[in-house]
Curated annotation (Swiss-Prot):
Low complexity bias locations: 353-368
InterPro entries recorded: HAT (IPR003107), HAT_Syf1-like_N (IPR055433), HAT_Syf1_central (IPR056350), HAT_Syf1_CNRKL1_C (IPR055430), Syf1-like (IPR045075), TPR-like_helical_dom_sf (IPR011990), TPR_rpt (IPR019734)
Gene: SYF1
Record text on subunit structure and interactions: Associated with the spliceosome.
Protein name per Swiss-Prot or TrEMBL: Pre-mRNA-splicing factor SYF1
Amino acid sequence: MASTSLVDSLTSHFPLTLPIPTPITHPHLIPSADLPVEEDLLHNPENLRSWLSYIHNVKEKIAADEPAKGGVLSPEEEILGPLASKNARDGLQRLVSIYERAIAVFPTSYKLWKAYYLTRQSYVLGELTNDAKEARSQQAKRGAAYKTNVRELLDGAEEAHEWTGGLDPVVGYAEWRSLVATGERMIMCLPNLPIPWLLHLGVLLHPKCPSVFKNGSYARRAFDRALRTLPPSLHGRVWGLYLRWAEIVGGDAGERVWRRYLKVDPSLTERHITYLLEAEEPRPLAAAKYLLSIARRAQQNLYSSLEGKSPYQLFVDFLELVEKYADQIGMDEEGTLELQRTKRAVEEKVDGEQPQVEGQEQQPQEEPASINGRLMRIAGPPVPLEQGKLFKPVNAASAQAPTQLTYDEDTDPSNPRLLDVEGIVERDGLQVYKDQAGRLWTGLATYWIKRGEFERATATFERGLAAVVTIRDFTQIFDAYAEFSETMISTLMDALADEDNLEDEDFDAEETEQELDERMKSFEELMDRRPFLVNDVLLRRNPNEVVEWEKRIALHGDDDAKVVEAYVKALDTINPRKATGPLYPLYVNFAKFYEEGGSKDDNGEPRNEPDLEQARKIFERATKVPFKAVDELAEVWCEWAEMELRNENYEEAIRLMQRATTVPKNTKINYYDDNIPPQSRLFKSLKLWSYYSDLEESIGTVESTKAVYDKIMELKIANAQVIVNYATFLEENKYFEESFKVYERGIELFHFPIAFEIWNIYLSKFVKRYGGKKLERARDLFEQALENCPEKFCKPLYLMYAKLEEEHGLAKRAMGIYDRAASTVQDSDKFEMYTIYIAKATANFGLPATRPIYERALESLPDKQTAEMCRRFARMERKLGEIDRARAIYAHASQFCDPRIEPEFWQEWNDFEIETGSEDTFREMLRIKRAVQASFNTETSFIAAQAAAASKGTEKPTDTSAQEAQDAADPMAAMERELSAAGADGARKGGAPAFVASTLNKTNANGIDEGGEETGEMANPDAIVMDEDEF
């Protein structure tokens, strides 16, 4: 009763501004202090600045007189909001009076109307929140692009229209109505400006706005009037408030507004879908249809998701929504089957129509129902697409057809018909996103599970397993299928274990147990079928995969009937020209299956009798298959002959080979031409002929074998191995001369390096056969072999030739052959060849005879090998007592040996000088060493030395000292310093100065004396001078 009296007392304060207060009706509106200003305005009413100044002063006085607000609001303050105090109510009346008199003078002043309406709003709507003030401040700073972006405007409308306080809509209804009426007057005076419209429409978003204005038709008509009045460039600002109002109001009215906008701009569809699902009363059917619509548009590049989602992601969102609200979105199983039957009937009717008779005019056919998607809703009832006229403005030069999809009930949110989820997933999902079939099939099955259609879900899983073509999709479906089966079994077991269910009369325990048994049996069968299902997936992906067919056959194990069925299906399915891998093993294994009597029992015995006739039929069929390669066809014939041999049908095997190797009249067929059937190229298959020759060698006669080999060589398909086999066969049968002729024929057919292998075998066989009996013939053969032999291959032939001469000929001729070999072989073999030559010359003629060989070796060998040969040469001279010659050879070799890389050489020379030399020779060796080191002391040589030392595993060389570098740069100055130091030592020892006689001999770049051995102090007076002829 107290609350009623409070409301009545508060309601009595209103209306405040209706009718408009005037000084006549409300004398307190003009205090005595304001009379001068009022008189001034009466005399000069057209001065807008005076009016605004007067209003500003009045607002300041009202604000100063306003009492301070406490922390806790009283009931009056909660209901009346800003108008809770008498000072505020009087101030409102006073301001309204002044504003109304000013507007009467300036009815089209935008500045005056805006200030007036904002003032009225502040007393009715309350105060904006801090977030709303900040949002409006940020919006004011944005550019012109923001004013046309409806998405940002919609978000801004939600942020910028939040208030605290406000006048109660019941108590202050009269004041709310007066505010709305004032807004109507403002937009009538300023109809073409957007701000007045936005201020007026913003009132309708206030949470305390009376429902008669907010939820009724008034708000919708006000927004529509704004869209009709303002130019299209400003419609975005209106739509931002309009859509926000539609979200606040909700219901059918709000949904109709959203549908109107989304027809023009579908970019906000995802936001609207979120709103539909998060509303107090979710509308999943409409949301699903919206999702399906944008998924289809995105797939046709007619829609771009603001959230960056792909068409597939949008369709998955639709599928997830269907899974979540299965009962509210999709049809039941009966409805789905009925719709499928209708579609099939329509398709059969269209396919069964008779073709038009020639000369008869075609009659227009009646447009079918919307099942085939041929209808488009333009306005009113559905009309055929062909009857929809293209709208063309009067002033337009041309018009284009709108890029929109034809009308479909599945994408019309206003249509209450439930969706055919199964058909949609098959048409829009599985046929479009074939690489994501696993997710789509499991989603469809989950939909049926959520609806309780477990049999339909099981059938869906089975269809998915039978349709996917990737292991990933198969695994996804199979795991979901197994999980569903386990869940069903667990649920049935829990139901049987629940005692409450046993006491329930409606619970049929026997039926539940029977269903549980069936489920468990199906689950076991599913697990057993997994290898076969995986194999099916791989074969669907590539039915020409031979290996997978072999795995399929192996999976059947001992089931002979299934094995035969798998073989037959594989051979009927595989395209021989597209087979992956060799195809012939399938035919061979199939024939062996019959040959061996099928699978074997536990004792290893065949379960059936061998069936050679059936095996021969399979081989016969295989010989007519157009394989990709001739070798596969050759393998078939060889395996067929092998089967006959295993069954001791030797004559039949020979006949098969004769049949397979039949030579046609036209032998100029290109063996490598894949356009020619392999059967026509089979006679040139070396594999087939090789098997035939081996077969003849085993069970045939010598003459028949020779005939086969001769035919191979006649067809010019023989290789080196065939030549060797043929010659070896003749040799084993004591046809030695014929075997040698075969070698010669092979040499004529082939060039090096293949001819080298034949020569190598031929010569070794010839020498082994005749030895020294036919020496001249053997020499001719060797000369013939070496005549065109490349230097890369001639070394073994020279060695064999020389060995022949050593064993059966003359040593002098052998030395000549070694000499020829040393100058003929390639550079990498010369060092070894000279080593052999020197060893043979030493053995036959002694050490002195090797001097000219060494000299020729030093001229022809590379630097590195020359150094090694010099060391050997020097050792030989030292053995002969020729010390000076050995020293000269060391000096010659020094130019090739970097001390940092070849320390062994210098150590050997050092030891030589210590053992056989003098102080002068030792000093000369040191001088040469420094000169050589100087010649190698360059950046490139140093890097090469480092690399060579690293490859040898020794310590890396380091740079010489400054003094050594200086000495290397000036070898003569270094020698003078050394001699001066030696003289000083002698003076200290002998007490008198010592002088060293100098000699002026010519030296080369490395400091080696180029004078004769007889000149200078370093000459050996006992040296023996010999000419080359005396060797």
